[in-house]
Regions:
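PLP-dependent aminotransferase-like
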Residues: 39-101
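Short glycine-enriched loop/turn motifs at secondary-structure junctions
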Residues: 2-3, 19-20, 119-123
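Active-site region of PLP-dependent enzymes
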Residues: 98-100, 104, 108-209
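A glycine-/small-polar-enriched, mobile loop at the entrance of the PLP active site in fold-type I
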Residues: 1-10, 179-182
Length: 209
């Protein structure tokens, strides 16, 4: 249970859970780091992961940072639409998908609130949607330098983490903006998947490590 200024982050996560249908939600500073944490939890080091050849460049970066290798799948046309699996893992890149009841059971769905094209224009930020309680607790500590939700004067440090947490003021803004995804009668609004053009990343040697 969060306390102090970080309680607002927990409230925002609860609102995302209610809207998306995910049992657990962990917010982070951006969606690229959400993908990285999900891949690290799934221990993908040394494995081959297949992604669309046309996607945002940070996706192959995070796969490589997590210790895996990339296999690019051909894409018809020059655009990418909606969410896709980082196969064969249960990690999904959902940067182009944010809608009511979107959560797919058994997955870690990584959503994005960054940039002018997203449905949720929070300027910055991302989240991991999951139904895995063990992963939920790991993500919460991993994003916060391995810390538990207490003062670092009282913590027992036994985990190496990263500084990926969402700033409380951004979570507060997100909580206020959640109203846009509900109708006046309280029912949820559904958003169409986004479709955006991306370069063919399979042409670049840097991703073939």
């Amino acid at each position: 249970m969060a306390n102090g200024i970080y309680k607002i982050t927990e409230d925002f996560e609860k609102s995302l859970s209610d809207y998306t249908g995910a049992p657990y939600v962990v917010t982070v500073d951006n969606q690229s780091n959400a993908l990285f944490l999900a891949l690290m939890f799934e221990n993908v080091k040394g494995k081959e992961i297949t992604i669309p050849a046309r996607t945002y460049p940070s996706v192959p970066c995070e796969i490589i940072h997590a210790g895996a290798k990339i296999k690019f799948a051909p894409v018809e046309g020059k655009t990418l639409k909606g969410a896709y699996q980082l196969a064969p893992t249960n990690v999904w890149d959902s940067a182009l998908c944010f809608t009511a009841d979107m959560y797919k059971p058994g997955t870690h769905m990584c959503v994005s609130f960054t940039g002018p094209y997203k449905h949720f224009k929070l300027s910055k930020g991302g989240a991991i949607l999951t139904d895995n309680l063990e992963a939920y607790h790991w993500f919460k500590r991993a994003r916060y330098s391995g810390r538990r939700e207490c003062s670092y004067h009282d913590d027992n440090f036994d985990m190496l983490g990263w500084n990926f947490y969402m700033m409380p003021e951004l979570a507060a803004r997100g909580l206020l903006l959640m109203n846009q995804f509900y109708n006046l009668d309280g029912t949820k609004k559904y958003n169409a998947d986004l479709e955006l053009p991306y370069p063919d990343l399979s042409k670049f040697e840097i991703y073939k490590q």
